[in-house]
UniProtKB/Swiss-Prot annotation:
Taxonomic source organism: Azorhizobium caulinodans (strain ATCC 43989 / DSM 5975 / JCM 20966 / LMG 6465 / NBRC 14845 / NCIMB 13405 / ORS 571)
Membrane topology of this protein: Peripheral membrane protein
Enzyme class: translocase
Keyword Transport: yes
Domain of life: Bacteria
Function (record text): NDH-1 shuttles electrons from NADH, via FMN and iron-sulfur (Fe-S) centers, to quinones in the respiratory chain. The immediate electron acceptor for the enzyme in this species is believed to be ubiquinone. Couples the redox reaction to proton translocation (for every two electrons transferred, four hydrogen ions are translocated across the cytoplasmic membrane), and thus conserves the redox energy in a proton gradient.
Subunit text: NDH-1 is composed of 14 different subunits. Subunits NuoB, C, D, E, F, and G constitute the peripheral sector of the complex.
Record-given protein name: NADH-quinone oxidoreductase subunit D
Keywords recorded for this protein, A-Z: Cell inner membrane, Cell membrane, Membrane, NAD, Quinone, Translocase, Transport, Ubiquinone
Pfam families: Complex1_49kDa
Phylogenetic lineage: Bacteria, Pseudomonadati, Pseudomonadota, Alphaproteobacteria, Hyphomicrobiales
Keyword Electron transport: no
Subcellular location: Cell inner membrane
Length: 402
């Protein structure tokens, strides 16, 4: 039957359009899959699907000695591996009452800040690429290459270092390496100035990031945010100042904060944090060149004997063998240790039962709390803004899925 203009049209149900963002999308930063519900080009709902990189890290750690558990932490946030080892080592040291010598603390802080540069350089450059700028990653990766060489010269590995140990670090840094790190720190600010000139004041970059993904301070705290996500919203909360660990209380640095809590503020905070990390690294280098001393605890329960000693003493050889096969025993108890990782507060809740293996090791990954807010942050924005918001969260799937 033909419809006239007056006759009733049959009702056609209008439903929103659903698309998959990832897991192969270049802006998904890993194996993230998000189901987006779109009304035209406006995002109505975001449903993140996680678990594609789940490896059962927390359970695996329960079957390993305290020393054997360290390499698992490199594989969480693989953009800044040593920062995660740091949290685990702090937890073990607090539980076992181990003192770390001053030189060991300085090396740890130095390499934690190198990790912060590695992570922030990767984030700000790929974030710029997500919104259309192609040059920053080429510049950023040149500097990251030098920093990864510092990792390699200290531990033998560019990424999965396993360099931090309960009680200190594996071995001392050569004098030349410390000098080279100092030389890098003196030239690094010019790269940040170049990035600032190219990206920070860029009109198109600002149009893509200003007033996108705004988080008020109340919302940030309610969602369990930490790190740059809180500082970008105006709270000067940094564990290096709020709950100082190692020798951070002796170092001079500032905590940059944002005003509006949008993607642009988070980017600017990360840029300024790199300058502050550079400042911390220079202070560590100056002190390492002047102050000698041990780099690991002198408590022989947790530190292996020297190579030369093992060639002379049968007891030292037995001690070395026992330490690396059975490991050291940690008293019963529970402890929470957190570090200011590049992504936010990375925490380790460790339960010891008096044996040589952890009874339970709960990992508090900052990216996990940040990812859950994707629906809240993207609702009402355009489809193109989803990758901008995701880039400003700085998510790595090693730590989200664990």
């Amino acid at each position: 039957m033909a419809h006239t203009l007056d006759s009733q049209q049959p009702a056609v149900p209008v439903r929103n359009f659903q698309i998959n963002f990832g897991p192969q999308h270049p802006a998904a930063h890993g194996v993230l899959r998000m189901v987006l519900e779109l009304n035209g080009e406006v995002v109505e709902r975001v449903d993140p699907h996680i678990g594609l990189l789940h490896r059962g890290t927390e359970k695996l750690i329960e079957a390993k000695t305290y020393l054997q558990a360290v390499p698992y932490f490199d594989r969480l946030d693989y953009c800044a591996p040593m920062n995660q080892e740091h949290a685990f080592c702090l937890a073990v040291e607090r539980l076992a009452g181990i003192e770390v010598p001053k030189r060991g603390q300085l090396i740890r802080v130095l390499y934690s800040e190198i990790g912060r540069l590695l992570s922030h350089l990767l984030n700000v450059t790929t974030f710029a690429m997500d919104v259309g700028a192609l040059t920053p990653p080429l510049w950023g990766f040149e500097a990251r290459e030098k920093l990864m060489m510092f990792y390699e010269r200290a531990s033998g590995s560019r990424m999965h270092a396993a360099y931090f140990r309960p009680g200190g670090v594996h071995q001392d840094l050569p004098q030349k390496l410390v000098e080279d790190i100092g030389e890098f720190c003196r030239t690094f600010p010019s790269l940040l100035d170049d990035l600032d000139a190219l990206v920070t004041g860029n009109r198109i970059f600002k149009q893509r990031t200003v007033d996108i993904g705004v988080v008020t301070l109340e919302d940030a705290l309610a969602w369990g945010f930490s790190g740059v996500m809180v500082r970008g919203s105006g709270a000067p909360w940094d564990l290096r100042r709020a709950q100082p660990y190692e020798c951070y209380s002796e170092l001079d640095f500032d905590i940059p904060i944002g005003k509006h809590g949008d993607c642009y503020d988070r980017y600017v905070v990360r840029m300024e944090e790199m300058r502050q990390s550079n400042k911390i690294m220079l202070q560590c280098v100056d002190r390492l060149l002047k102050e000698a001393g041990p780099v690991a605890s002198t408590d022989r329960k947790v530190s292996p004997p020297k190579r030369g000693e093992m060639k002379r003493s049968m007891e030292a050889l037995i001690h070395h063998f026992k330490l690396y096969t059975e490991g050291f025993h940690v008293p019963e108890g529970e402890v929470y240790a957190a570090v200011e990782a590049p992504k936010g507060e990375f925490g380790v809740y460790l339960v010891g039962d008096g044996t040589n293996k952890p009874y339970r090791c709960k990992i508090r990954a900052p990216g996990f709390a940040h990812l859950q807010s994707m629906d809240f942050l993207c609702r009402g924005h355009m489809l193109a803004d989803v990758s901008a918001v995701l880039g400003s969260l700085d998510i790595v799937f090693g730590e989200v899925d664990r």
